[in-house]
UniProtKB/Swiss-Prot annotation:
Reaction catalysed by this enzyme: Endonucleolytic cleavage at apurinic or apyrimidinic sites to products with a 5'-phosphate
Name recorded for this polypeptide: Endonuclease V
Family to which the UniProt record says this protein belongs: Belongs to the endonuclease V family.
UniProt keyword Hydrolase present: yes
Record's function text: DNA repair enzyme involved in the repair of deaminated bases. Selectively cleaves double-stranded DNA at the second phosphodiester bond 3' to a deoxyinosine leaving behind the intact lesion on the nicked DNA.
Major localization class: cytoplasm
One term under GO cellular component: cytoplasm
UniProt cofactor(s): Mg(2+)
Residues given in the record as Mg(2+) binding sites: D46, D114
Length: 237
């Protein structure tokens, strides 16, 4: 579990110190909205694995914020540096995600990451860690709860309930599609609690996942390719 990545400078590779670092970085998370009402670029990120887990495969998709059409797709591959440890996903996946970010030709105004934001036992899921490291506004979109509790949201698309941990809200349980389990939506960095919900709703189409992470999930999991429209460079870009 040793790593030489500068993102984890000072980490000795132990689980105990990783959790301590999470608590320190969580204090740097900003939960105020820093996203324009009319952003131009969104990005979605997700991670998969190859070679029996020996290679981490990070997918990045850049989208037009107005049309939600993809503008760029990229894959970054790095050697997997540590095994899966519950609650420490970012220490396993962040190096590949940062390499995928570096492949984008333009900087996104808002990032969606498949994983937790602050809906995490130490309030530093991968979307929060990514946001603190990069300074980019981030939202975490997870398929399962990692921390806290919530009342089941109503059955209709858009129904939502707060996720609470120790009396404080850490995210939302959002019914993004009827007859599907709710998504776990939480701010990662430089996005408010309400902003995380609003932006997720704005980027939903006919599927359970919002478009940024849905497209990234297709690339990362190899379930399908993402086609960039020929000659399309973005709405008013």
């Amino acid at each position: 579990m040793q790593t030489n990545d500068p993102v984890f400078a000072g980490w000795d590779g132990s689980v105990i110190q990783a959790r301590q670092l999470q608590r320190q970085l969580a204090r740097r998370v900003v939960l105020d909205d820093a996203v324009s009402a009319t952003p131009q670029l969104l990005a979605g990120f997700d991670v998969g694995f190859e070679d029996d887990g020996q290679t981490t495969r990070a997918a990045a998709v850049l989208l037009d914020a107005q049309t939600l059409l993809p503008l760029e797709t990229h894959i970054a591959r790095v050697p997997t540096s540590m095994p899966y440890v519950p609650g420490l996903l970012s220490f396993r996946e962040l190096p590949a995600l940062l390499q995928a970010l570096a492949l984008l030709s333009r900087t996104p105004d808002l990032v969606f990451i498949d994983g937790q934001g602050i809906a995490h036992p130490r309030k530093l899921g991968i979307a929060a860690h990514f946001g603190v490291v990069t300074g980019l506004p981030c939202i975490g979109i997870a398929k399962q709860r990692l921390a806290g509790s919530f009342a089941e949201p109503g059955p209709e698309r858009g129904d939502h309930t707060p996720i609470l941990l120790g009396g404080s809200q850490i995210g939302w349980a959002l019914r993004s599609k009827p007859r599907c389990n709710p998504l776990i939506v939480s701010p990662g960095h430089r996005v408010s609690m309400q902003g995380a919900l609003d932006w997720t709703l704005r980027t939903l189409r006919a599927y359970r996942l919002p478009e940024p992470t849905r497209l990234a999930d297709r690339l990362a999991s190899r379930r399908g390719e993402v086609t960039v429209p020929a000659g399309y460079s973005g709405h008013l870009l």
